[in-house]
């Protein structure tokens, strides 16, 4: 082969190699090119319609909150009173205290757990937005820090606000509930005159244990005409397709208004024995916010 022919061959081979390399790189780029971002769906755009940032020191805003009083539910040990809920340094604090004072509703030989207790050994608070702030559909969020010691039973939850429709027919959503080492996300409604529960449990040990409990976290309820999702720090905990509740007693409760409850319970049917726990126990809330799509904004 002459030098000229060899030179031509070398040059042609180089061109062929470059062409093959270009095709390979192009094909590889086509394979690894990121998927285009989805077009924004306007139905996923939320508008802030109500909030309580708890920035004013003193009692919670009476335009937003009222109180449960006394012994209320679940055979819990605490006596609910308004003075255990207060705002300080930009936080709502619901404080459970160990106290000892007479039960003003005590009745000798009573068979009712609320009135047969002669003494109050613990006090706390439960605040509720009933008749003040009620919503149908939306994104409900709370940023808070909870005490995970034995006996502590904090919750951020909703109940149905429809007059004359009682629990469980009115529905219940526990956006945040904690007791005995476990965070729960619960949804309940009435079916055949019994509460039908959808419950998801997450041990605090799996979330980070004591270190996790020292931080603030965001609990979310996303609710529209089709579904209800419960999230913790943006991660889905529980989900309900609302059609599943269409056969509920007195109709599907998840198409009707709800109100909020924030409370710090002690002991009772689920909270555990608080006798070895050092008080006070604090449920600290940074804010509660409600977002809605514009069609549902109130």
Predicted regions and their residues:
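Accessible peptide chain termini
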Residues: 1-2, 271
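Intrinsically disordered, low-complexity segments enriched in serine/proline and basic residues
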Residues: 4-12
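Bacterial N-terminal signal peptides
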Residues: 14-26
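GH16 jelly-roll
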Residues: 30-298
